[in-house]
Amino acid sequence: MKKQIGDRYEPKDVENKWISLWEKKKSFAPNSNARESFSIVIPPPNVTGSLHIGHALNHTIQDILVRIERKKGKSTLWLPGMDHAGIATQMVVERELAKESKKRTDFTREEFIHKVWEWKNHSGGMITKQQKLLGESVDWSRERFTLDEGLSKAVFKVFKSLYDEGLIYRGERIINWCPASQTAISDLEVEFRETKGKLYHIKYPIHGKKDQFLVVATTRPETMLGDVAVCANPEDERYTSLKDVVLDLPLTNRQIPLLFDSFVDKEFGSGLVKITPAHDANDFEAGQRLGLKPLLVMNPNGTMNENAGIYQGLDRFEARKKVLADLEAKGLIEKIEDHIHAVGHNSRGGAVIEPYLSTQWFVKIKPLADLAVQAVQSGQVEFIPKMWEKTFFEWMNNIRDWCISRQLWWGHRIPAYHCKKCKHFEVSETAVTVCTSCGSQEVEPDPDVLDTWFSSQLWPFSTLGWPDQTEDLKRYYPTSVLVTGFDIIFFWVSRMIMMGMKFMQAPPFHKVLIHGLVRDKDGKKFSKSVGNVIDPLVMMDKYGTDSFRFFLAATLPEGKDILFDESRLDGYRSFCNKIWNSSRFILMNLEESFVPIGITPDIEKDLEPMDQWILSRFNHCLEEYNKAHSKFHFYEMAAAIYEFIWGDFCDWYIELVKPRAYGKVSPRSAEVAKQVLSDVLIRALGLLHPFMPFLTEEVHSVFSDQYIVTTPFPESYPVASDSLGVQKLNLLQEIVTKIRVMRSENGVAPDRKCKAIVKSSDNLSSSTILENEVSLLQLARLESIRIDTLYEIQKTDSVSHFTKGEIVLPLEGLIDVAKEKTRLEKELQKSELEKEKLEIKLSNPGFLSKAAPEVVEKERDKLKTLIDKVEVLKKGIQNLAG
């Protein structure tokens, strides 16, 4: 063969080359001639985003699946795109304007939106370039954006349809309000943080009764200015005699009643709660039951309004301090306690969220949730691992109406229109400029935009052309599998199922593959504040993208988190180098005239035992790989191909076949060996390709002009796993491995050659040793090996059992027995001490309850390794003691 590969594997050069060639040749476009289809939609990253470790894991998993199905001949569509990310993008652009001492309100709405589009076109979408660097085999010609015209058409159609059915409505309710960004956010965007706060016990004077009070506990004293009642549990005997009591609301001139409702917890505080319907969700519901009118005391920007009296204009937290000071001055604070409680924060900006009474748009979610629940219960949608179904059902059964309006400028404008002249109101899929009731042109569109997740929930079918009945929609919907982290099951997965069942009468995907998070090696979540964030681009540049991808897949346990250990990346870089160097060895021993024809019947009839063995080992690898793939066990797939390539192929077969490859045997034997070497390498590259696309494509290009990305998925060889040749090589491998272990356990230096005696009367042992004596001497570093069933074992001999008998290594003269025994005893002492420490650690309930499960598992693995090591050391000492 004329083609060769370089002396060293240079990842960056290879990666840049193939990114360009794949795109130029449109290698990732769906095959329109294929009968079967396989489709995945990428969870659309934010247009503001850059590739983080979670993206890298999620996209690597998807790419592995897509590349496998493409090689299996299916028409694969992996559809990319980005989310307009309403609040996140608007905040980014506002920060850019702030650098010029400008703010959003300095512009008209249209001018500001124009600036956001400018930013999107110039600076947004950085993540697309980074996805290409990761080697993602998506069809970039189909890239979509949630504000595309087609997707917007789908959004407005869904809104109108749900509105017409009464499933979208406008109403006044308590919502999560962010005073910093001055917009509503959904329940799912509220991040509750455990906060060390205070519980204030405030005296509410009984009206007309001097020095008589009821004590109410609260964590938010500034909201008491909006109290309209105090409430007790009707079964609380402390207060049943006070049914007609009226209270003076402290710091105001208002009186409020004492009422009774079963939602009050008798055990919390004094058993009394203040009812503030405009600033608490539970109070709002209680207020509706009790017929109370809400009183809003806060402005949208978090300052107190005119209903707060003398506190008007103060920031909410300043108002809290002033209210407390005034209560203290009036002697109305009974006590203040330290109190740890969950405080809601905006998951994007971090501002403390206010429960706030506001008129917003909502989705009546229960009827839609029922559709999603039925889809999962009936098996139309399967969660993998199955444990996530329970989480899904729990959330769906406790779901509340979804607030979908946002007080932003960037996003899908709510398609509702209001006539200023006749007050007519209508919802329309297309813009309304003339009132359909009175003909007036004084029509105003609703000022709010939709929650970003409203458009994202339509992603699986809107990106395929819906509401138009396109060929893509017919062919690729439902999609085959959704790959996602557990953190967006509620944000996104559940809503997509609802919308798919509602508008497509079919779920958007058949399987939902849930993977864990990537954490640091101590099990902590990556966080900028902690300073442990890993940049995947840095890792890819340092170790090569293939090493990084393989690491993510190989360390991903089913449904659990990955603990990021950079040292393993170094190991997988070595794996890449091993493949490269082994490939170079094979190519250097192929003549220019060599043509890889595979294992044809003509080659098959002249296969030698070592050839039969490596073909059977490939079959075993393929079987394990396919079995793991069917269960989405990526770590098992990676382990199968890693062990085959590094162990069976490189460390065993290549070493065994070298004399034949060098031409030291008959020409026919050499020819067969070279066909086996090249064909097994090509098939192994085919299995490895989904994990390591760049390296495999580069090596494969030497053998074929067809890109490996589109070559057929490897098949098994027609060789029996129990043939005599395979049995002999399995036995040879066992003997060599046993001798290597014996040498190591007894401290025999690598450069010292031993004599080996095999005590076995088995014919297979005899023929294996006789036929492979040269290989045995070379691989086990032996001076000689012989079969002697009558050999009498000496005191200084090391003995090990194998399936057909015993192997004996005479150690006399090879090692200093006393010195080696002392070394092993010191090592044993050290290992037993480490083992004892780990056992104490793993029996500590505090560690077991606080540490991440992955960290506990890692420590258990360490203990198991130490237990095995201790046994080996004891055996070695015992051997030396005779």
Curated annotation (Swiss-Prot):
Native source species: Leptospira interrogans serogroup Icterohaemorrhagiae serovar Lai (strain 56601)
A cellular component term, taken from the record's GO annotations: cytosol
Subcellular location, record wording: Cytoplasm
InterPro entries for this protein: aa-tRNA-synth_I_CS, aa-tRNA-synth_Ia, Anticodon_Ia_Val, M/V/L/I-tRNA-synth_anticd-bd, Rossmann-like_a/b/a_fold, tRNA-bd_arm, tRNAsynth_Ia_anticodon-bd, Val-tRNA_synth_C_sf
Designated gene of the protein: valS
Highest rank taxon of the organism: Bacteria
Keywords from the named record: Aminoacyl-tRNA synthetase, ATP-binding, Coiled coil, Cytoplasm, Ligase, Nucleotide-binding, Protein biosynthesis
Motif ('KMSKS' region): 525-529
Record comment regarding domains: ValRS has two distinct active sites: one for aminoacylation and one for editing. The misactivated threonine is translocated from the active site to the editing site. The C-terminal coiled-coil domain is crucial for aminoacylation activity.
EC number(s) given by UniProt: 6.1.1.9
Classification via Pfam families: Anticodon_1, tRNA-synt_1, Val_tRNA-synt_C
Quaternary data: Monomer.
Recorded coiled-coil stretches: 812-881
EC top class named in words: ligase
Reaction catalysed by this enzyme: tRNA(Val) + L-valine + ATP = L-valyl-tRNA(Val) + AMP + diphosphate
GO molecular function annotations of the record: aminoacyl-tRNA deacylase activity; ATP binding; valine-tRNA ligase activity
Residue sites binding ATP per the record: 528
Any single GO BP term: valyl-tRNA aminoacylation
Extent of motif 'HIGH' region: 45-55
Record family assignment: Belongs to the class-I aminoacyl-tRNA synthetase family. ValS type 1 subfamily.
Descriptive protein name: Valine--tRNA ligase
Protein's UniProt keywords contain Cytoplasm: yes
